[in-house]
């Protein structure tokens, strides 16, 4: 009997029930149960086992005898990775596997746009299909717990609602277009240092309300097809064999019907992993190959367990039409439609932190622009450890400005300004490096500074493009601090003495210390690792073609010690003398030593990010949700009404400026008489609104009452607390000019 894969459509939408999100629409993964039962009945035990581990670096096997195609995985949540050799990390060097470099996760989150998240998933799906892929290894949706996190650039935000809504729409965008997603990294992979062996100790409430929430939303509201188990341990158990996380919560409570795969090299056992909920070991068969076959034949693992894992795989396989191998990689991947999506995300992600009048650039006054900084010309599609994109092209900030002012009387000149920090320079120099080479580096750095100063003196405007790069922010290790590398603080001070008219552009993925930049810049923008079209988007914002509309997806602290985990002394943990990383060792073909031990104490509990700063009255440098505009917005006429199972928050938003622009309105809720410990306020709704100059709109943001529940650790379930609630509305977590009170009495009873 031959079986063909079927094309299915995801059901868009969803509702909330019993204080957690759910989807009452049909789940495409459960539409072929009888057919799957028949397929499993035809399979041998060996064929079943062969599906449960990596066939090569980025695929797991199907069953050729039954015409069941392999599942092909697409690495990289912000662009489809180049094709690799079957059993190594070496590139195949094809001419057709370039891809669009989409803005990274923190950039997408800075759009605060569910529409952009959907388009992002759609764009990723289109390119994955051209490459013959079935499942995107993304989105990466771990909460940004620490400012120094190595993968903060890849993750979304510090807030579970913002991360969850974006994850839901990314998932829908991809799966509506016949490409599965794999949510990662489940769960509590919130640091890179020691991630391969660290044991996370977290309260049940914090785990449920903060860290699991984005995963739960994407599973329940978008029927995510895949989940990747994280490297770390939670409460003493590896995530890849964690019965509580994988069986009880993910499948038992949330109703997940897809596949659970290990992170690469992140499987630690055969029997425990098989019984603990792991479906696929990647990228090899160390535990789920012959060892698993032997366990089944010995009666240690029931064949029914194997059948259920195969069922999970076949559900995904039948929901996602396979691309015939002869059609994959036959044309260049990046297409104009995806490039346009990359531009739209980038242009909406740019955050204006400060503006003293230099922006937008006034070409009546500005004729000579000095662009200074290595990041003005540096490509960010690759670098460091982990996923990168073989981008067909990447418009740098300098190229974007040159194109924007091409054919005008504005002259643009460039100076490097500083030597970039490379991976090798982050470690102690080896003894073979001579004093003369150190002297050469110092002399070159000083020469670059003097060239930058000279150029600044001649210019009407200085655009300093600094920040981090992908060598500084990288998988496998967290940053030691949030100080700008390469002596950028000293450089900006020297430039300011030569020319005070400075616009600073920070190309970053995570928070940095901007105190010196703030003091020496008239205007500051955050432009992120912003993809193939990042330079064009930045130039359009600088020139005033569009108004900046991004909002910070995380808090910028004044100093690192203000952030919760650092303040409480629970991060960084004491590292082994020679710390190892499971992924880095896998790439280097070196055996990972999992016997190393460390604990991560989440002592801040639910007080992550802005929840901490607001509750502890610690002023940040720039708050969560902050972002200015070239327009001016006015909030007024707030009303809040309970409407059946939701709170409808209505207000008027006016653009009283002279430029068309977009604003992200944010709704926070305070519970002033709560019997439990709560943050000063929590984000419960947001909406991006486009307004023409002088335009006014009535805005309504609906908040499901279930979203106001908290996790009761005594009852081990969601609980709705009655009593007063203060609704706060504004443009950031610290700028909330409107507030009103409602009474939540006899309005909702959890099922």
What is each PLM-predicted segment?
Residues 7-15:
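Bacterial N-terminal signal peptides
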Residues 16-713, 717-734, 749-750:
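Glycoside hydrolase catalytic-domain context in secreted enzymes
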Residues 1-6:
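Bacterial N-terminal signal peptides that target proteins for export
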Residues 735-751:
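Short beta-strand elements
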